[in-house]
Amino acid sequence: MLGAMEGVLLSVATSEALLGIVGNTFIALVNCMDCTRNKNLYNIGFILTGLAISRICLVWILITEAYIKIFSPQLLSPINIIELISYLWIITSQLNVWFATSLSIFYFLKIANFSHHIFLWLKRRINIVFAFLIGCLLMSWLFSFPVVVKMVKDKKMLYINSSWQIHMKKSELIINYVFTNGGVFLLFIIMLIVCFLLIISLWRHSKWMQSNESGFRDLNTEVHVKTIKVLLSFIILFILHLIGITINVICLLVPENNLLFVFGLTIAFLYPCCHSLILILANSRLKRCFVRILQQLMCSEEGKEFRNT
């Protein structure tokens, strides 16, 4: 039975999950409709669609597992169920970070201004960059899956007294957690480097504009600032997401603590919910579609009120 605080936090987490699903579904649908209309899925559209779909899957996995764990934990008793959930979580979470990193690199290569020959070479060969990122993703899966298999096969993840518990030392749990998310950390570090380089590019561009004393509206600076805001928001929200997931992993060492588990879930769902909204507002095409839908909804509501009067 959930307490009052646990019920409130679970309601908040569920609302965040639903908003995340709606926002990411909107992003995926808009890009798919553009692909159907133009008979071509361009790089940014493919990345945004993949990011949205991976987040939708991630949210469904987390919220389904959470509700089962809280209300019907006995459903998780078969070993193959928890193994399947672990595999799905690894695939979707790492795909999600891969698409987000690819998006940041795509913007970086399109927007940043550097004269270094390595940057210019990468800018002309963006497909090679994406191939390298795919290699990082595959290597991450190669390291992650054996760790989960070993934990399950060694019976270190057991269903006891109506709850899942991990039977290992805290140091061993931390090591396994790091190995499982090694690819995520690598991609996240790449994103931090990209964000840092974009800030340097913005600073150099601003210094150049000041030296020229240009009074014209600088669109390049606006694009730089907008992109940096999106990247920084992703970094902050993803750190919160990792903290929330870590709290949920710790709950396996502290059984029967639903309050801590639901609190971690609430923090974890901030990322797919808020960042999808940020992407919609930052992308002019998505923003136009979003505003158009809101206007149509408002007009339909006004029409209903007019007919009722």
Curated annotation (Swiss-Prot):
Record key words, sorted: G-protein coupled receptor, Glycoprotein, Membrane, Receptor, Sensory transduction, Taste, Transducer, Transmembrane, Transmembrane helix
Glycosylation sites: 161
Cytoplasmic side: 29-43, 109-127, 204-233, 281-309
Transmembrane segments: 8-28, 44-64, 88-108, 128-148, 183-203, 234-254, 260-280
Topology feature Extracellular, residues: 1-7, 65-87, 149-182, 255-259
Keyword Ribosomal protein (UniProt): no
Chief location category: membrane
Membrane topology type: Multi-pass membrane protein
Keyword Transmembrane (UniProt): yes
GO MF term set: bitter taste receptor activity; G protein-coupled receptor activity; taste receptor activity
Compartments it resides in: Membrane
Source organism, top-level taxon: Eukaryota
GO cellular component, as recorded: membrane
PANTHER family tied to this protein: TASTE RECEPTOR TYPE 2, TASTE RECEPTOR TYPE 2 MEMBER 114
Other remarks in the entry: Several bitter taste receptors are expressed in a single taste receptor cell.
Sequence similarity: Belongs to the G-protein coupled receptor T2R family.
Function: Putative taste receptor which may play a role in the perception of bitterness.
The protein's name in its UniProt record: Taste receptor type 2 member 114
Organism: Rattus norvegicus (Rat)
Gene: Tas2r114
